[in-house]
């Protein structure tokens, strides 16, 4: 029997280019929680070898979406709002990102996400909301 976490990871790598670009590894998925890891890569950095804020934000968005997915009983979801505080420069990978569902309503799922370096230092903290889609949305 195939590992369900690996199966989800493969589906996202095929369907989501940013997931593939960031080389996301899904560490854990359970109801209301997702943990992923991304590597340190030079192409992810800005001056001084510090991880670029856009990379951190993208990884947080992916992780929050995966956490929301674990409680979503509908067809799909989209990021509605994402607020982040960058707390420390990040330069020591791999980086661990953990999302925890705070509340699932009928139309919105609220998730808290933390971004940490290889030593467990908290580099960013975010809160976001994912809008629940009851019908599948396709790009035109």
From Swiss-Prot:
PANTHER family: ACYL-COENZYME A THIOESTERASE 13 (PTHR21660:SF1), THIOESTERASE SUPERFAMILY MEMBER-RELATED (PTHR21660). GO terms for molecular function: fatty acyl-CoA hydrolase activity. It holds the Pfam family 4HBT. It comes from Saccharolobus solfataricus (strain ATCC 35092 / DSM 1617 / JCM 11322 / P2) (Sulfolobus solfataricus). Belongs to the thioesterase PaaI family. The lineage of its organism: Archaea, Thermoproteota, Thermoprotei, Sulfolobales, Sulfolobaceae. Gene3D superfamilies: Hotdog Thioesterase (3.10.129.10). This is Putative esterase SSO2140. It is an enzyme of class 3 (hydrolase). It comes from the Archaea. Keywords: Hydrolase. Its EC number is 3.1.2.-.
